[in-house]
Swiss-Prot record:
InterPro entries assigned: Thymidate_synth/dCMP_Mease (IPR045097), Thymidate_synth/dCMP_Mease_dom (IPR023451), Thymidate_synth/dCMP_Mease_sf (IPR036926), Thymidylate_synthase (IPR000398), Thymidylate_synthase_AS (IPR020940)
Record protein name field: Thymidylate synthase
Catalysis: reaction(s): dUMP + (6R)-5,10-methylene-5,6,7,8-tetrahydrofolate = 7,8-dihydrofolate + dTMP
Assembly and oligomerization: Homodimer.
UniProt xrefs under Pfam families: Thymidylat_synt (PF00303)
Length: 297
């Protein structure tokens, strides 16, 4: 049986290769790009977890980065200590100097995702400052509203803060999401769905990671709110393939997607900050081998 949900990702990759607009980009690599393709939709029901199978996705990196966001952390060295290097380039001394952040210590990424999720509107000093009680804790507010007012239409998590963009090592690509609680009329359990808007979508490296990350966040919030996961919907703006990824993606397109794995959470948790790596159990993940692609910065 064809994995139709992963196939929609592969179909979009093929469409961009065939029809994408040739565009320059900030990194100088060059891209093929389309704008506002049809959203991707993934069911999270029955413990299904949308971890792409046509190449191996670094799930430990997905989990640890998300836990780092949830803690409100912005120091890439904390991830490097766990042998996760996805933020190394943007936190390097050379890169920070190149964008004018010469006074930042190496690894200090500025007020990026986690800071905005937990302290939106607070004044960013550095990655070592304690910001407890400062700014708007969007994540805590969402969880509280889901528990007390599940029909609320303001279950919004935004990483896009125009006042802070120049302080960030990299402005947020996955920038805004909305949660929705489905209250069934029958005896079924309520479900939590999430829709993400991503302004800049690197189809080769970033998007497979982002799909897994926001699906995981949805499952975690559902778990602490005693809901079942529903759907994850991925809405994309500038959806692009870096030219030096085309060959690798053409290789990936030759692979037939396999069934998605399942995700189980190993213990009862009511505080989202209590999750650790050991709480996530990915089963029946049988991907093809890794396909390496270079990150453009």
């Amino acid at each position: 049986m064809v994995n139709a949900e992963e196939q929609q990702y592969l179909n979009l990759v093929q469409y961009i290769i065939n029809h994408g607009e040739d565009r320059p980009d900030r990194t100088g690599t060059g891209t093929l790009s389309v704008f506002a393709p049809s959203p991707l939709k993934f069911s999270l029901r029955n413990k299904t977890f949308p971890l792409l199978t046509t190449k191996r996705v670094f799930i430990r990196g997905v989990i640890e980065e998300l836990l780092w966001f949830i803690r409100g952390e912005t120091d890439s060295l904390k991830l490097r200590e766990k042998n996760i290097h996805i933020w190394d380039a943007n936190g390097s001394r050379e890169y920070l100097d190149s964008i004018g952040l010469t006074k930042r210590q190496e690894g200090d990424l500025g007020p990026i995702y986690g800071f905005q999720w937990r302290h939106f509107g607070a004044e960013y000093i550095d990655c070592k400052t304690n910001y407890i009680g400062q700014g708007v804790d969007q994540l805590a507010n969402i969880i509280q509203k889901i528990r007390t007012s599940p029909y609320d239409r303001r279950l919004i998590l935004s990483a896009w803060n125009p006042a802070d963009l120049e302080k960030m090592a990299l402005p947020p690509c996955h920038m805004f999401c909305q949660f929705y609680v489905h209250i069934p009329s029958n005896n079924h359990r309520p479900e939590l769905s999430c829709q993400l808007y991503q302004r800049s979508c690197d189809m080769g490296l970033g998007v497979p990671f982002n799909i897994a990350s926001y699906a995981l966040l949805t499952c975690m919030i559902a778990h602490v709110c005693d809901l079942d996961p529903g759907d994850f919907i991925h809405v994309m703006g500038d959806c692009h393939i870096y030219k030096d990824h085309i060959e690798a993606l053409q290789q990936q397109l030759t692979r037939s997607p396999r069934p998605f794995p399942t995700l189980s959470l190993n213990r009862s948790i009511t505080d989202i900050e209590d999750f650790t790596l050991d709480d996530f159990n990915i089963q029946n993940y049988h991907p093809y081998e890794t396909i390496k692609m270079k990150m453009s910065i």
